[in-house]
């Protein structure tokens, strides 16, 4: 059997020493070893994944973001790094940056419905309503049973109507107030069929039921469902 080069043996030894440090929760020691290995070819993806996780354990945000960004460039077909970076930006309130990275994710994997759905939620939060509707439509085109995307379309209109209601409350002129209320009711009505379809897709989802109850009550319609 052909003997492996000494350098390969050394790299393997360092890698397994790093794994031992990770498992033993010697985070600083693990980081030092993984940093020395991260640009090499031996188990390169795993090394960078472990390095990110160790920086998370050390609560070093700058370094774990940097690790993810570098790994995304080096391993463009490995979605794990991109997904973790997107999650970080979402949960840290950097929604526009998350939207930008989701565009990359969609370009790489256009047939993942959840990418479109998540971007739709973020666009809706940012007030990008047309973009949000397009994202939800794209998600449903890939997965017609994705009830959350259907409800997302309803929510786009529902939340706009809530905002119009808040604005109408500040109007003192009676004629203008009635006009604002009419506009608000029209937008609320637009949300109704999407929540009805979402309820048909997922009849046990209570958030859809509660929203529909409120909409039916608003328009004095009968609640044609079994609420549990």
What do these predicted ranges mean?
Residues 3, 36-37, 70-71, 104-105, ...:
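Canonical positions in the second alpha-helix
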Residues 3-6, 39-40, 74-75, 108, ...:
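Structural marker of alpha-solenoid helical repeat scaffolds
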Residues 159-197:
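Short coil/linker segments at helix-helix boundaries
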